[in-house]
């Protein structure tokens, strides 16, 4: 078994997420982050013969797994696209406003993190790439080679929430003048040496690597586009289930769901007798945020930071 094929992914909040979708046997569902198919497989078990499931992923290895599943089960189709583009895909299929549930499991999968060739991790040395789809866009090495010091600092600070972002960016620019960054371990060492206050139990390079990965893949921009598209794609009564893994993602999801659950009546004159439909809430929040259980965290430490939020379309 090759190193890549042996890499395993443990699906986070598996039962909870599929239960939150409130699966209808004949419904149409979207798995916006297919990954290695954990959520999709369980969802298919709950669909009847007329149910349909459409999976999205940018990662070519995830697509290969999805195509194998599609060959086994005719109710499932997978496309190599970001979930940010789900609106276009849904429209092409005539599903706009007719999707029963959408699941987004954000972040990077274990196979991506653990495979040195992908360049996501400082723990396993590999090419400094970080792209979810290696055939598209600019690699982390290419971006680090050309970005100015202020831009590097902004990415580390805004997306990695790294308080020593300026100091780290300065170290990166000074070092690249001598030789380009090509390996993850090389960048990690420079970042580690530039961080004067290590957090217990966390590598000094963790936050900067997170910020770089988010920027390279436009993760927050994709999330905002994907949430807007998901709301339009859902039918009334359809569920949106989102699992996030860091505060930046969760803040976007929380604010999106709250904004659409509140509506925009506060923008209208107070004495208006009837609230126009365009200003009424489009979502209602379902339950409280859910977190991985102690047992799940023990079995899969990467689930510790997971937060799941659920909303239902009402208009």
Curated annotation (Swiss-Prot):
Gene Ontology CC terms: cytoplasm
Keyword Transferase listed: yes
Major site of localization recorded for this protein: cytoplasm
Sorted UniProt keywords: Cytoplasm, Methyltransferase, rRNA processing, S-adenosyl-L-methionine, Transferase
Catalytic activity: cytidine(1402) in 16S rRNA + S-adenosyl-L-methionine = N(4)-methylcytidine(1402) in 16S rRNA + S-adenosyl-L-homocysteine + H(+)
Similarity field: Belongs to the methyltransferase superfamily. RsmH family.
Function: Specifically methylates the N4 position of cytidine in position 1402 (C1402) of 16S rRNA.
Protein name (database record): Ribosomal RNA small subunit methyltransferase H
């Amino acid at each position: 078994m090759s190193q890549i094929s042996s890499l395993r992914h443990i699906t986070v909040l598996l039962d909870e997420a599929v239960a939150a979708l409130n699966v209808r046997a004949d419904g149409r569902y979207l798995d916006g982050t297919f990954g290695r198919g954990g959520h999709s497989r369980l969802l298919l078990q709950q669909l009847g013969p007329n149910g349909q499931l459409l999976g999205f992923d940018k990662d070519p290895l995830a697509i290969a797994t999805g195509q194998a599943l599609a060959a086994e089960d005719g109710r499932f189709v997978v496309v190599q696209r970001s979930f940010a583009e789900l609106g276009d895909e849904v429209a092409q299929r005539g599903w706009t406003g007719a999707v029963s549930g959408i699941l987004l499991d954000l972040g990077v999968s274990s196979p991506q993190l653990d495979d040195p060739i992908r360049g996501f991790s400082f723990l396993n040395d590999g090419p400094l790439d970080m792209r979810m789809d290696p055939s598209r866009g600019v690699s982390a090495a290419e971006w680090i080679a050309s970005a100015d010091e202020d831009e590097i600092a902004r990415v580390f600070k805004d997306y990695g929430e790294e308080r020593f972002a300026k100091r780290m960016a300065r170290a990166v620019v000074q070092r690249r003048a001598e030789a380009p960054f090509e390996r993850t371990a090389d960048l990690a060492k420079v970042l580690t040496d530039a961080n004067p206050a290590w957090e217990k139990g966390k590598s000094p390079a963790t936050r900067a690597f997170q910020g770089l990965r988010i920027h390279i893949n436009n993760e927050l921009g994709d999330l905002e586009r994907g949430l807007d598209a998901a709301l339009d794609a859902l039918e009334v009564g359809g569920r949106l289930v989102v699992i996030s893994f860091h505060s930046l993602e969760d803040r976007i999801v929380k604010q999106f769901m709250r904004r659409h659950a509140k509506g925009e009546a506060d923008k209208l004159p107070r004495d208006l007798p009837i609230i126009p439909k365009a200003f009424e809430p489009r979502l209602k929040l379902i339950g409280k945020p859910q977190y991985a259980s102690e047992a799940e965290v023990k079995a899969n430490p990467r689930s510790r930071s997971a937060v799941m939020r659920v909303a239902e379309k009402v208009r």
